[in-house]
C-alpha cells in the first residue's frame, strides 16, 4: 500500500476528478450562507444544494470538492469510538444531470485501484448494492476488476430523506484484515456492511434517479427523475486511517500531532493507541474538539449561549474538562490551535493565518469557563448543603440542569462533586429537562427563520400586507389579516383568535415593522388596542414566501382576526439599528476607497449594539489602512451628510452610480440609498437621517473568516465612546501597575520587565539542573536487588514531572540500576515516573507495564513506552505502597 499523507490523499482525489472534467470547488465556510435550515455545513453536498434543487445552474455540471463539515448530534460518542468526529472532511464528486452510474462506478474503481492514483489492492475491496439495482451490480461486474464474490446486496442501500430526489447507492468497503476483526467469523454482522471493525466503509456512491413524491411510501412507485444526479462521499479521516494503518481515525497525521502536544501539556499521561481507556478517550476528545473549535472560530463563529456559539462553547468546555482529567491545569487549548493550523495548512492556509485571532478567542473563553467552574462550585455546594439538611440522598435533575444550562456547570462535574458528598444525581430527570430544551430549540429554529421552506400555511397565505417603515414607525388602525398558530392537534394553522400567553404569528394589512433582511435585524415593538393598551409584544419579523411581513408576537391580551390595532416600533432599537446600517454603507465605501474598487461585500450583520461587515480581500488589512478607514468614516460623519432614498427602475439606478451588493438578486424596481455624494447603494433597509447622527465610529476587530474573506466588527455613537473609554482605562491601569509616570512610558517598562523575566528564567533553569545533578548523586547509591534485578526508588522534592525527567536523564547516562522509580508531590497531586534500562527491557521488564501495576496505589493511572512511563494520582500517602509494589513486580520477572 502507498505511504500517503492526508494532504496527498485529499489532493489526489481532487486531481483525479479534475482530470475527468470536474470543476474543483474550494471548501466553503462552515457557516451556511442563505440557508437558515442548517446550523452548520454538515455534509459535502450541503454547499451544493442550490445546484441540486435547480435554484442555480452550475457553470460546469461536474463538480468535486473536499468540504469541511461539523456535526454534533453524537458528541457523546467522540473519543469512545474509532470514527466519531465533530469536525470532518467529506471528499466527493458530483454530477448535476450529466454523467451517471456508467461512468461514476468505473471512475471510483480507477481512483481506488490504479497505480497512478491510490493503488489499493483490489482483493481487499468489497461493495454493496441495493438488491433492485441490478444495473449497478452489472456495471461493477463488467466494468471493473472487482473479484468474484465481493458484491453484497443490502436492503438499506437506498438513499431517501423524504420528499424529493432519492435513489439506490453503492458503498465501498476496505478489508483491513484479521488483525482488525472484532467478531467471530460466524457472527451475522461479520460482512462488508455489517457492524464490525474489519470491513471499513470508505466511499458511498449515491445514484439520485427517483423523485419521492408526496404520499408515496414504496420506493418502487417513485417516478424517475428527468435529470439524474450523482452524489458521492468519501470521509477523509476514514480513508487516511486505511493508508496509515491507524487502529482508529485518531491514529493518523490528522490527529496524532495534537495528541502528542497534549501529552506534553499533561506531563502525566501518554496516549496508547493499542487499547481503549479513559485516558485515551480524553486525548481523542481534546484532539477532535480543538479542530472543530479552531475551524469554527476561524470561519467567524464565536462562543455564546445559543446557536453555533453554544456549540463552540460546549466543545471547548468538554475539552477543558478532559484536560483536567489528564492533569492539565490552567489554560491549554490555545497552545493546540497552531498545531491544527500546521496540520491543515496545505488546503486551509487561512487557519494558520488566523491563528492569533483564534487563540485570543479560545483563551478568553477558557478563562471565562475557569471562572464558571469556580462560581458553579459555590452554587453546587449550596445545593448539596440543602440536600443534606433536608435528608435527601439525591440532587434533583432540575437543579443539575439549572447548573448546566444557566451557569454552564457541566453535569459530569456535578456528579463528581455529588459523589464526594455521598449523594447521587437524578440523571433521568436531567435528561428529561435536556430533551425538553432541545425540543424548544428545534421549534425556535423552524418557526420563522425557515418559513419559506417549512411552513405550508405561510406558503399558501395570500393576504395583502404593506410595509411603510421607511417613512413612519407608528401605524394606527392597522387590521389583523392573519393569525397563525398551533391548532388543537398541534399543527400550524390559520386561527380566528389569539389567546393570552400564546406565541403566534400575525400579519397586518399595513406595518411599520422592518422584517429581517439583507443582514439587518428586525424591528421589535408593541401591538396596542384602540384603548391604547398593549396587547402583544413583537419579538421577531420575517418575510413570508409571498412577501408579507410576518410578526411573531407574545400575546398579553387576546385578540381576534379583523381587529383594528395600533402598531408602535421600539424606537431605541430602531434608531440604533438604523445608525449602524448607515455606518455599514459608509464602511463599504471607505473600504473601496482605501483598499481599491475590487473590494465587495460578502455579508453583513446590523445589530443595535454593533455592526459586522464581511468583504473580499487577500490577507489582513494593515493597521495603517484600518486607521485610514476609521479616519475617513469619522470625517464623513462630521460633515453631517444627508441620507436620502428613492425608488426607481434598476437601469436608472445603475446610471446614478448605485452599487449593487455582490451576489444579491434584484427585481425591476429598486430602492437606492444615498449618503450625500459619498455613497450610493441598492438597499431596502432603514437608515439614519444624516451621518452626524452616528456621532462616532470605531473599528473593534478585523479578522479572516475564510480564504480571501475578511471581517470587520465596529461600533458607533455611545458604544464607540465606551470602547475608547475602556481602552483608556486599561492603559491607565497598565501604566499604574508598571509604575510608569506617563502612558507613553508604559511600553519601555514592559520591555524592561520582559528582559528581567528572561534573566530569572535562565537562572531558574540553571538551578533546576544543578539540583537534579545533586539529587541524582545521592539516590543512585541506594540500589536494591530482588530476583537478580536491581532497582532504585526515591521520593524527591523537585518541580513536578519535568524535575523527575531531569533526574531520569542523569540516570540514563550510566544506568546504575535496571529500573528507576521516582515520585514527587505538588499540591496534593502525585507525579510518578518509571525508567527501565535496555538490558531490563531485554529480560522482559517494561516500564509501561510496571507503572500500570503500581499507579493504583497513588490513586491514579498511567502508561508509556517500554523504556519510560509516567503516571499521576491524587493519593500521596500511597507512595510507599507503590514503591513496595516495585519489588513484588520484579520478583515475578
From Swiss-Prot:
Top enzyme class = ligase
Q: Its GO CC terms?
A: cytosol
Give the matching InterPro entries.
aa-tRNA-synth_II/BPL/LPL, Ala-tRNA-lgiase_IIc, Ala-tRNA-ligase_IIc_anticod-bd, Ala-tRNA-synth_IIc_core, Ala-tRNA-synth_IIc_N, Ala-tRNA_ligase, Ala_tRNA_ligase_euk/bac, DHHA1_dom
Q: Classify the source by domain of life.
A: Bacteria
Localization recorded for this chain is: Cytoplasm
Question: Which keywords does UniProt give here?
Answer: Aminoacyl-tRNA synthetase, ATP-binding, Cytoplasm, Ligase, Nucleotide-binding, Protein biosynthesis, RNA-binding, tRNA-binding
UniProt-recorded Gene Ontology molecular function terms: alanine-tRNA ligase activity; aminoacyl-tRNA deacylase activity; ATP binding; catalytic activity, acting on a protein; transferase activity; tRNA binding
Listed under GO biological process in this entry are: alanyl-tRNA aminoacylation
Q: Is Aminoacyl-tRNA synthetase among the key words of this record?
A: yes
Q: Which Pfam families match?
A: DHHA1, tRNA-synt_2c, tRNA_SAD
Write out the catalysed reaction: tRNA(Ala) + L-alanine + ATP = L-alanyl-tRNA(Ala) + AMP + diphosphate
Q: What is its main location?
A: cytoplasm
Q: Which SUPFAM superfamilies match?
A: Class II aaRS and biotin synthetases, Putative anticodon-binding domain of alanyl-tRNA synthetase (AlaRS), ThrRS/AlaRS common domain, Translation proteins
Q: Which NCBIfam families match?
A: alaS (TIGR00344)
- Name the protein family: Belongs to the class-II aminoacyl-tRNA synthetase family.
Entry's free-text remark on domains: Consists of three domains; the N-terminal catalytic domain, the editing domain and the C-terminal C-Ala domain. The editing domain removes incorrectly charged amino acids, while the C-Ala domain, along with tRNA(Ala), serves as a bridge to cooperatively bring together the editing and aminoacylation centers thus stimulating deacylation of misacylated tRNAs.
State the protein's purpose.
Catalyzes the attachment of alanine to tRNA(Ala) in a two-step reaction: alanine is first activated by ATP to form Ala-AMP and then transferred to the acceptor end of tRNA(Ala). Also edits incorrectly charged Ser-tRNA(Ala) and Gly-tRNA(Ala) via its editing domain.
Q: What is this protein called?
A: Alanine--tRNA ligase
**Organism from which the protein derives:** Leuconostoc mesenteroides subsp. mesenteroides (strain ATCC 8293 / DSM 20343 / BCRC 11652 / CCM 1803 / JCM 6124 / NCDO 523 / NBRC 100496 / NCIMB 8023 / NCTC 12954 / NRRL B-1118 / 37Y)
Amino acid at each position: 500500500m502507498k505511504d500517503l499523507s492526508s494532504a496527498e490523499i485529499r489532493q489526489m482525489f481532487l486531481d483525479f476528478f479534475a482530470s475527468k472534467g470536474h470543476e474543483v470547488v474550494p471548501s466553503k465556510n462552515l457557516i451556511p450562507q442563505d440557508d437558515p435550515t442548517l446550523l452548520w455545513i454538515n455534509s459535502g453536498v450541503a454547499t451544493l444544494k442550490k445546484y441540486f434543487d435547480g435554484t442555480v445552474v452550475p457553470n460546469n455540471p461536474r463538480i468535486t470538492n473536499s468540504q469541511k463539515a461539523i456535526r454534533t448530534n453524537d458528541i457523546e460518542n467522540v473519543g469512545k469510538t474509532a470514527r466519531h468526529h465533530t469536525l470532518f472532511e467529506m471528499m466527493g464528486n458530483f454530477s448535476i444531470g450529466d454523467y451517471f452510474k456508467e461512468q461514476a462506478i468505473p471512475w471510483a474503481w480507477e481512483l481506488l485501484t490504479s497505480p497512478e492514483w491510490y493503488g489499493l489492492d483490489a482483493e481487499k475491496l468489497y461493495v454493496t448494492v441495493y438488491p433492485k439495482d441490478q444495473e449497478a451490480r452489472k456495471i461493477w461486474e463488467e466494468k471493473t476488476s472487482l473479484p468474484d464474490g465481493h458484491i453484497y446486496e443490502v436492503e438499506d442501500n437506498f438513499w431517501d430523506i423524504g420528499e424529493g430526489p432519492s435513489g439506490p447507492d453503492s458503498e465501498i468497503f476496505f478489508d483491513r484484515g484479521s488483525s482488525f476483526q472484532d467478531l467471530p467469523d460466524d457472527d451475522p454482522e461479520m460482512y462488508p456492511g455489517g457492524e464490525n471493525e474489519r470491513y471499513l466503509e470508505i466511499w458511498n456512491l449515491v445514484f439520485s434517479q427517483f423523485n419521492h413524491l408526496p404520499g408515496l411510501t414504496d420506493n418502487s412507485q417513485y417516478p424517475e427523475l428527468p435529470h439524474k444526479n450523482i452524489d458521492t462521499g468519501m470521509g477523509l479521516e476514514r480513508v487516511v486511517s486505511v493508508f496509515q494503518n491507524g487502529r482508529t481515525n485518531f491514529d493518523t497525521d490528522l490527529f496524532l500531532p495534537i495528541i502528542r502536544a497534549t501529552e506534553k501539556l499533561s506531563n502525566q499521561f501518554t496516549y496508547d493507541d493499542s487499547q481503549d481507556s479513559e485516558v485515551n478517550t480524553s486525548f481523542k476528545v481534546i484532539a477532535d474538539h480543538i479542530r472543530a473549535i479552531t475551524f469554527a472560530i476561524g470561519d467567524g463563529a464565536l462562543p455564546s449561549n445559543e446557536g453555533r456559539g453554544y456549540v463552540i462553547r460546549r466543545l471547548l468546555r468538554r475539552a477543558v474538562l478532559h484536560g483536567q482529567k489528564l492533569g492539565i491545569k490552567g489554560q491549554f487549548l490555545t497552545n493546540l490551535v497552531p498545531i491544527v493550523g500546521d496540520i491543515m495548512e496545505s488546503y486551509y492556509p487561512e487557519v494558520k493565518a488566523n491563528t492569533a485571532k483564534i487563540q485570543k478567542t479560545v483563551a478568553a473563553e477558557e478563562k471565562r469557563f475557569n471562572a464558571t467552574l469556580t462560581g458553579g462550585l459555590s452554587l453546587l455546594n449550596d445545593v448539596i448543603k440543602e440536600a443534606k439538611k433536608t435528608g435527601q440522598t439525591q440532587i434533583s435533575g432540575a437543579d443539575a440542569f439549572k447548573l448546566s444550562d444557566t451557569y454552564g456547570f457541566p453535569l459530569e462535574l456535578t456528579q463528581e462533586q455529588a459523589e464526594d458528598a455521598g449523594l447521587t444525581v437524578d440523571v433521568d430527570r436531567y435528561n428529561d429537562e435536556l430533551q425538553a430544551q432541545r425540543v424548544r430549540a428545534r421549534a425556535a429554529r423552524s418557526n420563522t427563520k425557515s418559513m419559506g421552506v417549512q411552513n405550508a400555511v405561510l406558503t399558501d397565505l395570500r393576504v395583502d400586507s404593506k410595509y411603510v417603515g421607511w417613512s413612519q414607525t407608528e401605524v394606527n388602525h392597522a387590521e389583523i389579516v392573519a393569525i397563525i398558530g398551533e391548532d388543537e392537534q398541534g399543527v400550524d394553522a390559520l386561527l380566528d383568535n389569539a389567546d393570552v400567553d400564546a406565541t403566534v404569528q400575525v400579519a397586518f394589512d399595513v406595518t411599520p415593522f422592518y422584517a429581517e433582511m439583507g443582514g439587518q435585524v428586525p424591528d421589535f415593538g408593541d401591538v396596542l388596542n384602540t384603548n391604547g393598551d398593549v396587547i402583544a409584544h413583537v419579538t421577531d419579523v420575517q418575510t413570508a414566501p409571498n412577501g408579507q411581513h410576518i410578526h411573531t408576537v407574545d400575546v398579553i391580551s387576546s385578540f381576534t382576526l379583523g381587529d383594528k390595532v395600533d402598531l408602535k416600533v421600539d424606537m431605541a432599537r430602531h434608531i440604533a439599528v438604523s445608525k449602524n446600517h448607515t455606518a455599514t454603507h459608509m464602511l463599504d465605501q471607505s473600504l473601496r476607497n482605501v483598499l481599491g474598487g475590487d473590494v465587495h461585500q460578502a455579508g453583513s450583520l446590523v445589530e443595535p449594539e454593533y455592526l459586522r461587515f464581511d468583504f473580499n480581500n487577500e490577507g489582513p488589512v494593515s493597521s495603517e489602512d484600518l486607521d485610514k478607514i476609521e479616519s475617513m468614516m469619522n470625517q464623513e460623519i462630521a460633515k453631517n451628510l444627508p441620507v436620502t432614498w428613492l425608488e426607481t427602475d434598476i437601469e436608472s439606478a445603475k446610471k446614478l452610480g448605485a452599487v449593487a451588493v455582490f451576489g444579491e438578486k434584484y427585481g425591476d424596481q429598486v430602492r437606492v440609498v444615498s449618503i450625500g455624494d459619498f455613497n450610493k447603494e441598492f438597499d431596502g433597509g432603514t437608515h439614519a437621517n444624516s451621518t452626524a447622527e452616528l456621532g462616532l465610529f470605531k473599528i473593534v476587530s478585523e479578522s479572516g473568516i475564510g480564504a480571501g474573506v475578511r471581517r470587520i466588527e465596529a461600533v458607533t455613537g455611545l458604544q464607540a465612546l465606551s470602547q475608547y473609554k475602556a481602552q483608556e482605562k486599561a492603559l491607565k491601569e497598565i501604566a499604574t501597575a508598571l509604575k510608569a509616570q506617563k502612558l507613553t512610558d508604559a511600553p519601555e517598562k514592559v520591555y524592561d520587565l520582559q528582559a528581567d523575566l528572561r534573566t530569572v528564567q535562565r537562572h531558574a533553569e540553571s538551578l533546576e539542573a544543578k539540583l537534579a545533578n545533586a539529587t541524582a548523586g545521592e539516590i543512585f547509591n541506594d540500589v536494591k536487588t530482588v530476583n537478580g534485578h536491581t532497582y532504585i526508588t526515591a521520593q524527591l522534592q523537585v518541580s513536578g514531572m519535568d524535575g523527575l525527567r531531569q533526574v531520569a536523564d542523569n540516570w540514563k547516562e550510566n544506568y546504575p540500576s535496571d529500573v528507576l522509580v521516582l515520585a514527587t508531590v505538588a499540591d496534593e497531586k502525585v507525579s510518578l515516573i518509571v525508567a527501565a534500562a535496555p538490558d531490563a527491557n531485554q529480560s522482559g521488564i517494561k516500564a509501561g507495564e510496571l507503572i500500570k501495576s503500581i499507579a493504583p496505589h497513588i490513586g491514579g493511572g498511567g502508561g508509556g513506552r517500554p523504556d519510560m512511563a509516567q503516571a499521576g494520582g491524587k493519593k500521596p500517602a500511597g507512595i510507599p505502597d507503590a514503591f513496595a509494589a516495585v519489588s513484588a513486580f520484579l520478583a515475578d520477572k
